[in-house]
Curated annotation (Swiss-Prot):
Family: Belongs to the GTP cyclohydrolase I family. QueF type 1 subfamily.
UniProt function note: Catalyzes the NADPH-dependent reduction of 7-cyano-7-deazaguanine (preQ0) to 7-aminomethyl-7-deazaguanine (preQ1).
GO molecular function: preQ1 synthase activity
Main localisation: cytoplasm
Organism: Nitrosomonas eutropha (strain DSM 101675 / C91 / Nm57)
Record-listed E.C. numbers: 1.7.1.13
Keyword Cytoplasm: yes
Annotated gene: queF
Subcellular location: Cytoplasm
Catalysed reactions listed for this entry: 7-aminomethyl-7-carbaguanine + 2 NADP(+) = 7-cyano-7-deazaguanine + 2 NADPH + 3 H(+)
Entry protein name: NADPH-dependent 7-cyano-7-deazaguanine reductase
Length: 139
């Protein structure tokens, strides 16, 4: 049995719904096709989100990302479509998708798209003093 690409995103219940925490994912092998030339475009996607009630299931995300391999789409459009589909599936408190497309015609393209759940406000950051570097020997 072979695994096939799919546009269906699956989720699971967020195990810690009482706390804001960030989930960070890196997807280094995204591919789609240039809608003008049909040539492949390659990108590294970085996904950061703060879940609410649902988290994205990794295998379904992999198959979803894979589904773009043979689709012709502009960088801006595909980044926003992926973000929109993730928002529909998870309804996160916050989500940011960064697409860093590799050079094409001497130009690198980066697209950043974000969504915030209505009424959600991030907690203020906590800045802690850093400690001096520790060594396992004393002088």
């Amino acid at each position: 049995m072979t695994t096939q690409p799919s546009k269906q995103l699956e989720t699971f219940e967020n195990p810690i719904q009482t706390r804001d925490y960030r989930i960070h994912m890196e997807i280094p092998e995204f591919t789609c096709l240039c809608p003008k030339t049909g040539q492949p475009d390659f990108a590294r996607l970085t996904l950061d989100y703060i879940p609410d009630k649902k988290c994205i299931e990794l295998k379904s995300l992999k198959l979803y990302i894979w589904s773009y391999r043979n689709e012709g789409t502009f960088h801006e459009a595909v980044t926003n479509q992926i973000l929109d589909d993730l928002v529909i599936a998870m309804k996160p408190r916050f989500i940011r998708l960064t697409s860093k497309f590799y050079v094409r015609g001497g130009i690198f393209t980066n697209v950043v798209a974000e969504h915030r759940k209505k009424g959600w406000h991030p907690q203020p950051p906590v800045f802690l003093e850093s400690f001096d570097e520790q060594f396992n020997t004393r002088s």
